[in-house]
């Protein structure tokens, strides 16, 4: 709870600048729709839900065409977005904006690899291993986490970066490089 309150305070202090975007994750979603309760605090549900709501979490965030010389589009999400999952649910990326997180939805699809019952994991439940064998969504460079697995370094490839390794990173929009953020 202390970490969540610290995060909310940090985000509130950064509201005047557009460089902090909060993404909705699998642990967050369970406080809204009551499904998939892993690491879920029943006795603090309403307070946690309110704090997470204050962060205005997004399911994804897109940055496009940062420089005209080398145009790129970056897609940020909690766990990576695949064409397989979107097609399986007859969704396009923009449809995610209309999902009601207070109800059970395709967001609750947990892949077999994570102990779930779905062939494809959602953008908050997918694993790195599943992402690697599926078709990434369109022509975006994807940046995501959700697959720590004890890693101490990020997994950075030509079409994606999985940054869940207990370190903060920033996307340098001038050099288009992912850099470790040193406080």
Model-derived segments and their meaning:
Residues 26-27, 78, 143-148:
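Histidine-centered divalent metal-coordination motifs
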Residues 24, 76-77, 162:
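Short hydrophobic beta-strand that contains or immediately precedes a catalytic carboxylate
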Residues 58-69, 170:
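Short, surface-exposed beta-strand/loop micro-motifs that present aromatic residues
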């Amino acid at each position: 709870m202390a970490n969540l309150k610290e995060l909310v305070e940090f985000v509130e202090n950064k509201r005047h600048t557009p460089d902090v975007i909060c993404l909705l994750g699998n642990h967050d979603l369970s406080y809204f729709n009551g499904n998939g309760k892993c690491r879920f605090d029943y006795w603090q549900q309403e307070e946690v839900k309110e704090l997470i709501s204050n962060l205005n979490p997004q399911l994804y965030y897109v940055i496009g065409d940062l420089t005209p010389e080398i145009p790129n589009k970056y897609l940020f999400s909690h766990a990576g977005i695949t064409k397989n999952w979107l097609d399986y649910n007859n969704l396009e990326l923009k449809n995610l904006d209309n999902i009601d997180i207070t109800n059970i939805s395709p967001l609750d699809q947990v892949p077999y690899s994570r102990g779930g019952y779905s062939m494809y994991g959602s953008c908050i439940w997918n694993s790195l291993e599943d992402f690697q064998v599926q078709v990434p969504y369109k022509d975006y460079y994807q940046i995501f986490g959700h697959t720590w697995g004890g890693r101490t370094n990020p997994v950075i490839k030509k079409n994606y970066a999985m940054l869940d390794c207990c370190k903060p990173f920033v996307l340098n929009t001038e050099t288009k490089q992912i850099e470790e953020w040193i406080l």
